[in-house]
Amino acid sequence: MTATAQRQLPLDTTGAGQLAQQAELHPELNRAHVRFINLGKTYHGKQGAVEALGSIDLAIQRGEIFGIIGRSGAGKSSLIRTINRLEQPSSGRVLIDQVDIGEFNEDKLVELRRRIGMIFQHFNLMSAKTVWQNVELPLKVAGVPKEQRARKVTQLLELVGLQDKHKAYPAQLSGGQKQRVGIARALVHDPAILLCDEATSALDPETTQSILGLLREINQRLGLTIVLITHEMAVIRDICHRVVVLEQGRIVEQGPVWQVFGDPQHEVSKTLLAPLQLGLPKEWAERLSEYPQRPDAAILLDVHFTGVSDEGPDLAALFATLGGKVQLLQGGVERIQDRAIGHLILLIAGSPHPREELLLRARQLAPRVEVLGYVG
C-alpha cells in the first residue's frame, strides 16, 4: 500500500469523455453533491509561488457530514472555500450537482452562495444588532418581504433553540448561543450545503457537544450536506461520516471515519490521531526491553480491533487463545458509526505459545497486533 491515496477512488481527471467513463465505472460519482476534479490552487507573492492545493480528486455525497483534517497549512481552508468560490482554483474543477461552478458569472455566483451556508470560529455577528436582526439581515439584503422574513427568522430561532433570546444582543450571549445565531443566519436561504470552518474551536467541551448535536439534527431534519474543517479530532469522530486527511495540499488518506480513526495508514493521520490513542503507561515503558531477558519473560502486545459491527470484539475468545495469564494494562472499546473500535495493551505471562504462534493466534481475532516488547 502506498503512502498516499490508500482509500481513494481512482479518478481520471481530463475531458468530458473520461468523465462519462468514470460515471460508468463509479456510479457513486453521479450522486456526488460536491466533486473536486484535479483541483489545484497556487498563491503568488513576493516570495514566489506557493502551491496550497494540488491534484485534489474527491467526491462528497449528498446528505453526508464530511470532515477535512490536516496540520496547519495543509490546505483545509483553501479547499473548503473553493466550494462557494471564495477561492478561485488555479487549475481543475469544482462540480456541484454535476455543474462546473468555474463557469458561473457574478449573478450565478450570488445565487450559488445563497445556497451554501457558512459558519465560522468567531461567529461574525454584528454587535449593534439583536439576535433577530442578525438572522434577518441576509434576508433583508436579498429583498425578501417583511412578513416572509419574520416567518423565516421565527422558524430558525426555534430550530436552534433561541426563540427566547430574539431581543438579546451578542454581548449578552454565551459562546454557544452566538454560534447558534451564526447557524441560524447561515440557514436563512435554505442552503443545500453548510460549510463549517473551525465552528467549535472557540467553545468549551460541553458547549461543543451541544453544537455538534444541533448540526447532527440539522443534517438529519433538513438533509443538508455538511463539510467541516477542524483541528479537534474528537469532533470528526463524534459527528462525521467520512473524513479526508490533507498534507501539503495533497490527499494522503480518506475513508469512513471508523476506518481511518480505527486503523490510520499514513504517518500524518497517525500523528493527528495520536491524542485519541492509548499510550503505554510510563511505569511499564520503563520496564520494557526489546528481547526477553529470561525464558519466562512476559510479552506485551498492542492489539487493535477495527470495524467490528456486532456486539463488539470477543475479548474472552482472544484471552483464551493467547493462553497463560493475560493482564489488561490499558485499553477500551468505543463505537464509531455503529462499529466497535478497540485498542488494548495486554501483558501475557506464561503462555505456552512461542512469539510467532502467539501473534498468529491473536491476528485471527484482531486485525492489527504488534509486540511492544518484553517484561522480565
From Swiss-Prot:
Part of the ABC transporter complex MetNIQ involved in methionine import. Responsible for energy coupling to the transport system. The keyword Oxidoreductase does not apply. Keywords: Amino-acid transport, ATP-binding, Cell inner membrane, Cell membrane, Membrane, Nucleotide-binding, Translocase, Transport. The gene is metN1. Transmembrane segments: none annotated. The complex is composed of two ATP-binding proteins (MetN), two transmembrane proteins (MetI) and a solute-binding protein (MetQ). Its EC number is 7.4.2.11. SUPFAM superfamilies: ACT-like, P-loop containing nucleoside triphosphate hydrolases. It is found in: Cell inner membrane. Belongs to the ABC transporter superfamily. Methionine importer (TC 3.A.1.24) family. GO terms for cellular component: plasma membrane. It is an enzyme of class 7 (translocase). It catalyses: L-methionine(out) + ATP + H2O = L-methionine(in) + ADP + phosphate + H(+); D-methionine(out) + ATP + H2O = D-methionine(in) + ADP + phosphate + H(+). GO terms for molecular function: ABC-type D-methionine transporter activity; ATP binding; ATP hydrolysis activity. Pfam families: ABC_tran (PF00005), NIL (PF09383). Residues 34-273 form the ABC transporter domain. It comes from the Bacteria. It is a peripheral membrane protein. ATP binds at residues 70-77. InterPro entries: AAA+_ATPase (IPR003593), ABC_transporter-like_ATP-bd (IPR003439), ABC_transporter-like_CS (IPR017871), ACT-like_dom_sf (IPR045865), MetN_ABC (IPR041701), MetN_ABC_transporter-like (IPR050086), NIL_domain (IPR018449), P-loop_NTPase (IPR027417). Its main location: membrane. This is Methionine import ATP-binding protein MetN 1.
